[in-house]
């Protein structure tokens, strides 16, 4: 894999990034018409590879470019008691921000908090006040969730990706990797990736629960750039299990490689498993 020096920020003022994002909108597979996948993939790949400070403003501008103008912010309007659930959000600009915020919050357990925080702060700089999102997705974790509940929710979330295979993976970890096993269940899934796996999409404050494919889009967009062979194979398989058709998983994997190349990282899939290495799954019957 060849690493290239960082992109010249001035190049982002030309047609390079808008063209890339336009192509991503066309090529990234989605099962839902209003899916945010077209901006989440470049957001997550660029943040994983350290380009958030250059890319985030352009990604936000592109993601909202075809939306109607947000309603004007009123300094006299009463504060909202609580952010509406994602399904009830009436401001499409704020919903875009919510998806971007939650994608970066989830990604921090995969790519590291510093890069996620950098991207979140860059996002906050460019979001106008009328599109600011004050949702607190994990508020319940502070209020009423016991450790046992968190473990159960984590197992429910992790099982949507690994199904019965998680038993063998956890058995492999148990002798010498008990901390990693605990983190995977309680923190990675129970707190970051699937904090409301026990809720229905209608009652969950997590926007990712509105579309079962988004979690796989997030995990692949953050682990493929890191070239972690086992995790990539597991999550290619998990994407099929979470409802993405095999050929769309292939297209997603290829598009992640395109964005990696634009970030200066070539051949990210070289020598790494592809969807062709995934056995036929029950969901494909």
What is each PLM-predicted segment?
Residues 203-285:
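Alpha-helical oligomerization segments
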């Amino acid at each position: 894999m060849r690493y290239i020096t960082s992109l010249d920020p001035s190049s982002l003022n030309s047609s390079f990034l808008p063209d890339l994002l336009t192509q991503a909108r066309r090529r990234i597979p989605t099962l839902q018409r209003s899916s945010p996948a077209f901006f989440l993939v470049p957001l997550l790949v660029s943040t994983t590879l350290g380009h958030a400070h250059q890319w985030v403003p352009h990604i936000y501008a592109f993601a909202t470019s075809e939306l109607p103008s947000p309603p004007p912010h009123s300094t006299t309007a009463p504060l909202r008691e609580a952010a509406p659930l994602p399904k009830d959000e009436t401001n499409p600009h704020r919903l875009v921000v919510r998806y971007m915020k939650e994608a970066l919050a989830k990604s921090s357990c995969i790519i590291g908090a510093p890069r996620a925080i950098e991207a979140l702060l860059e996002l906050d700089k460019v979001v106008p006040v009328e599109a600011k999102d004050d949702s607190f997705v994990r508020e319940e974790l502070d209020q009423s969730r016991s450790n046992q509940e968190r473990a159960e929710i984590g197992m429910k979330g992790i099982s949507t990706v690994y199904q019965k295979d998680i038993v063998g993976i956890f058995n492999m970890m148990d002798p010498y990797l008990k901390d990693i096993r605990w983190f995977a269940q309680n923190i990675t899934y129970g707190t970051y990736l699937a904090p409301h796996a026990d809720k229905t999409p209608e009652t969950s404050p997590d926007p990712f629960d509105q579309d079962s494919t988004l979690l796989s889009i997030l995990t692949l967009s953050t682990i493929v750039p890191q070239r972690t062979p086992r995790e990539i194979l597991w999550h290619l398989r998990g994407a099929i299990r979470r409802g993405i058709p095999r050929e769309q998983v292939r297209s997603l994997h290829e598009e992640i490689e395109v964005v990696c190349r634009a970030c200066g990282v070539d051949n990210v899939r070289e020598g790494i498993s592809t969807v062709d290495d995934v056995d036929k799954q029950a969901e494909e019957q």
